[in-house]
């Protein structure tokens, strides 16, 4: 394949097919483990799953949450579209049951499905994003739980930081620019320097709590309640997060 052909194929890829690669790991490798621990504790305290409950971390990434749940003795599986992230997670945690897949088509059935750290809203249309909820509803056992940790659009609009700069090394800097365009938060990500020169984009479609609850209900998941942060504060219109959970009836 020529360089021109490779460039054309790259340009045809969706942002989420490009971005979750080695550079993603470099930038986000040391994400706040404290937040992950808080959310896992909140999940366990709220849903109180049995130790033999089958749990799926949808869009598990490099396995942060899977590892924590596994260490607590739970039967956890993880699915992610990125072959690289799944491979890295398996190398670091060989005991975990992780596999590559698309969140719009979930194989198997589970007692609990988790969508953590804004792993929703990746697709351009509402119909495609709703397919994720539809797939979750079809893959939950009766009485099973769905836990969705998402942005709160109202809070985001008030607090959006237009630009941040991160120095990965003396020769590589990452510039991230953010804006909201047509109900989608768009992040332009550039790696610039002597030993890095890459450009990515991240796009997340914004949904209110009411939007999410409507999709839950449409696909057989009864919304129960929502938290506003990882400490378990009750959800408010100005909360930082919308952490919604519901049960398949």
How would you describe each model-predicted region?
Residues 112-127:
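A short SAM/SAH-binding and catalytic strip from SAM-dependent methyltransferases
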Residues 56, 63-105:
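Class I SAM-dependent methyltransferase SAM/SAH-binding core
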Residues 104-113:
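A short acidic, Gly/Pro-enriched loop at the edge of an enzyme's catalytic core
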Residues 147-215:
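SAM-dependent methyltransferase
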Residues 211-249:
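C-terminal lobe and adjacent flexible extensions of AdoMet/dcAdoMet transferase-like proteins
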């Amino acid at each position: 394949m020529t360089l021109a052909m490779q460039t054309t194929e790259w340009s045809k890829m969706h942002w989420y097919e490009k971005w979750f690669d080695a550079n993603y790991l470099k930038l986000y490798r040391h994400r706040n483990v404290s937040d992950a621990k808080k959310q896992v504790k909140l999940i366990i305290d709220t849903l109180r799953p049995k130790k033999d409950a089958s749990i799926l971390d949808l869009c598990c990434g490099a396995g942060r949450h899977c590892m924590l749940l596994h260490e607590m003795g739970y039967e956890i599986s993880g699915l992610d579209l990125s072959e690289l992230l799944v491979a890295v997670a398996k190398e670091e945690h060989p005991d975990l049951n992780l596999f590559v897949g698309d969140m719009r088509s979930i194989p198997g059935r589970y007692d609990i499905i988790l969508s953590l750290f804004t792993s929703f809203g990746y697709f351009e249309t509402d119909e495609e994003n709703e397919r994720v909820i539809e797939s979750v509803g079809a893959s939950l056992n009766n009485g099973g739980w769905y836990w969705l940790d998402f942005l709160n659009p109202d809070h985001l609009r008030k607090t959006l930081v237009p630009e941040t700069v991160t120095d990965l090394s003396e020769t590589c800097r990452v510039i991230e620019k953010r804006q909201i365009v047509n109900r989608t938060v768009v992040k332009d990500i550039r790696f610039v320097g002597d030993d890095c020169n890459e450009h990515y984009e991240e796009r997340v479609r914004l949904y209110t709590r009411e939007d999410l609850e409507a999709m839950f209900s449409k696909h057989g998941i009864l919304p129960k309640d929502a938290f506003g942060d990882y400490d378990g504060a009750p959800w408010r219109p100005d909360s930082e997060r919308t952490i919604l959970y519901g049960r398949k009836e």
